[in-house]
């Protein structure tokens, strides 16, 4: 009871500080979010809340795919969809509000360009959207379905797990729906709270027959999405919605592909392997810089990119070299995909490990609203875990 009372008292002080409008450092706030600064305007506060926990780091400008154009992530998704519709006359895009451009504007202009028979709205029924997509794909056409938020993909869980993933196997490959791609905005955004912030990739990692992909940047998003659309298996493509406008870089105008199930070593190192995907990649890149500056520690940074089937070889090769592994994701710790990576690595690389594998993830609670800054695995939490590994 004493612990509960202390926690309640801390929360009341936090609310009081907010009501007075002069946030200050509160006891027990921790390094990650100890300082809460006064906001000049509501808009300033919202902007700070959205981008405070990471700094987007663009990739080098690609030169092997022809002319490029600066795009943010939602524009790169639009470009990929535009390329697919232009290349494949059977391709169709559908979902809630898709014909109007979607809530994040990823399909803006496509209905006007390709017609209402190829880009169209659906009722608000996720199970129906995916079931409809399976039917389209079974005919041999290319189906690109949008679930408006990853948090609302669960009504379609049965259609994805028991129908789409198994269709080829239960028919002996007489029929398949491999030309189905399901897009969905994913992850925290700064103000999404319970129903617009979740990272459900681990739910689908236990489902053989589908592929799950999460990009970290506009360049990656376009190349990986095109690969998903062209892949012969049903794919779920989760798009980090906080990066829709926070991330911008040079992206090729013409179509190109980035291979699925191949992790990318973004930065080579010798002391610790850092693994993440989506937005969290930018967090661990900052952690790698902090470790180099403050501790003299060399970190190898890896973007997993494809959750299932994941690239075991690249991760294990790195851990054999460094002897230490830290995995970070926004989803809750228990049952998160970091657990699968950790289990596999300790089986394959046990004698090479110099310290226990560390998982820095979200808490085992529903995603909070005003306490999101405390919930997310920011660079300070990752840095503290890395320091403990080095000192083990």
Curated annotation (Swiss-Prot):
Thiamine diphosphate binds at residue 152. It catalyses: N(6)-[(R)-lipoyl]-L-lysyl-[protein] + 3-methyl-2-oxobutanoate + H(+) = N(6)-[(R)-S(8)-2-methylpropanoyldihydrolipoyl]-L-lysyl-[protein] + CO2. Keywords: Acetylation, Disease variant, Lipid metabolism, Maple syrup urine disease, Mitochondrion, Oxidoreductase, Transit peptide. One of its GO terms (cellular component) is nucleoplasm. Its EC number is 1.2.4.4. Together with BCKDHA forms the heterotetrameric E1 subunit of the mitochondrial branched-chain alpha-ketoacid dehydrogenase (BCKD) complex. The BCKD complex catalyzes the multi-step oxidative decarboxylation of alpha-ketoacids derived from the branched-chain amino-acids valine, leucine and isoleucine producing CO2 and acyl-CoA which is subsequently utilized to produce energy. The E1 subunit catalyzes the first step with the decarboxylation of the alpha-ketoacid forming an enzyme-product intermediate. This is 2-oxoisovalerate dehydrogenase subunit beta, mitochondrial. The lineage of its organism: Eukaryota, Metazoa, Chordata, Craniata, Vertebrata. The gene is BCKDHB.
């Amino acid at each position: 009871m004493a612990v509960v009372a202390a926690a309640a008292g801390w929360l009341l002080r936090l609310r009081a500080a907010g009501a007075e409008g002069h946030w200050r450092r509160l006891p027990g706030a921790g390094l990650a979010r100890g300082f809460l600064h006064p906001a000049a305007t509501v808009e300033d506060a919202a902007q700070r809340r959205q981008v405070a926990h990471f700094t987007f780091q663009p990739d080098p400008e690609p030169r092997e795919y022809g002319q490029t154009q600066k795009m943010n992530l939602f524009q790169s998704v639009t470009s990929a969809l535009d390329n697919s519709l232009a290349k494949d006359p059977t391709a169709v895009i559908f979902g809630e509000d898709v014909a109007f451009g979607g809530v994040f504007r990823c399909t803006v202009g496509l209905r006007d360009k390709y017609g209402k028979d190829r880009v169209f709205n659906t009722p608000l029924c996720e199970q129906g959207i995916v079931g409809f997509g399976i039917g389209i794909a079974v005919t041999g056409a290319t189906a690109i379905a949008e679930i408006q938020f990853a948090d609302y993909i669960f009504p379609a869980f049965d259609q994805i797990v028991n129908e789409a993933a198994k269709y080829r196997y239960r028919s002996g490959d007489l029929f398949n729906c491999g030309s189905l791609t399901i897009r969905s905005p994913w992850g925290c955004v700064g103000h999404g709270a319970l129903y617009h912030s979740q990272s459900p990739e681990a739910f689908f990692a236990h489902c053989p027959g589908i592929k799950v992909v999460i990009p970290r940047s506009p360049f990656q998003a376009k190349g990986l999405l095109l690969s998903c659309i062209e892949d012969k298996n049903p794919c779920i493509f989760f798009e980090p919605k906080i990066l829709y406008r926070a991330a911008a870089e040079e992206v090729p105008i013409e179509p190109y592909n980035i291979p699925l199930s191949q992790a990318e070593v973004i930065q080579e190192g010798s002391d610790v392997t850092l693994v993440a995907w989506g937005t969290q990649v930018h967090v661990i890149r900052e952690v790698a810089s902090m470790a180099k500056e403050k501790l003299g520690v060399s970190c190898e940074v890896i973007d997993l990119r494809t959750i299932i089937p994941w690239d075991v070889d690249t991760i294990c090769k790195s851990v054999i070299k460094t002897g230490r592994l830290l995995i970070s994701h926004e989803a809750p710790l228990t049952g998160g995909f970091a657990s699968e990576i950790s289990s596999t690595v300790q089986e394959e690389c046990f004698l090479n490990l110099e310290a226990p594998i560390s998982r820095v993830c979200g808490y085992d609670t529903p995603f909070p609203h005003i306490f999101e800054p405390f919930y997310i695995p920011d660079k300070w939490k990752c840095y503290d875990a890395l320091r403990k590994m080095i000192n083990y």
